[in-house]
Amino acid sequence: TVQVLPGEYRLRNAVHLRDKVRILGSGEDSVLIKEASVKVKLADDSDWYDQEITLENATGFKVGDGVCLRAKNPHDGGNTVIKRTLVARSGNRFKLNAGLRKNLWLSGNPTAATLFPLLNCEHVKHVAIENITLDGNRANNENLNGNYAGCIFAQDCSRLIFRNVEARNYNGDGMSWQICHDVVVENCHSHDHNGLGLHPGSGSQRPVMRGNKLERNNIGIFFCWGVRHGIAENNINIENDIGISIGHRDTDNFILNNDVLRSKKGGIVFRPDNRGKDFGPHRNRV
């Protein structure tokens, strides 16, 4: 257990959690807040095997910073997104904690920005985050969508617990977990995000979301692709654009006893998907 004592802690990088770690705060008195983001263009090409980048202007960047590198893929025009940490510096050139594994060529207009989740879980299990306040400092940060970040972000994990957490003001999602199984979110308050309040991400099995309050988000609870055998129960959704959204291959979920109030565009939305006979949201009970 890592106990976070009362205070405001300003983050220049994510807190990366490991197996069997419990983060225990002091409620509203323990606040992790993201520092303002800085964005700059890259000044030189970097190939997929490189572990360095060169910035046009390194003002606002320090060794230890979490960064998000983005560009257009030079081969197919798609989006390239890479999350790394700056670990060494020589002038405007920085070494990264790991190789790029994708090409960042000037033809794709690559940029670096100090964007990251506040608490980050990747390939871990049996993690708990409890009784803490997370502030994304939305007014001073660029958007980074919930496939990559949030106040809490998890990727390829299992058996996570988020309990009595206030997640607020992220320019993206509040809590997002991608291909994560048996995630429990209880008695949390996720509000005032540009993106989603709770985002059980693609392929996530058996999420339990119970007793949460979701306010003034783009969507309160968003079932991404292929979320199955989940429970969303006794949650309060207030003044979101959409209260609850469910769609592509989201099957066998129970959505029970939720209050969905004053939604701006829709209370509960079943997203249409006509690309295949099994692509719709089937056998869900509301």
Model-derived regions, located:
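Right-handed parallel beta-helix
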Residues: 65-102, 122-215
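The right-handed parallel beta-helix/beta-solenoid scaffold, focusing on the short coil/turn
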Residues: 7, 13, 19-21, 29, ...
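Extracellular beta-strand solenoid repeats
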Residues: 3, 10, 16, 24, ...
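Short alpha-helix capping/helix-loop boundary micro-motifs
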Residues: 50-58
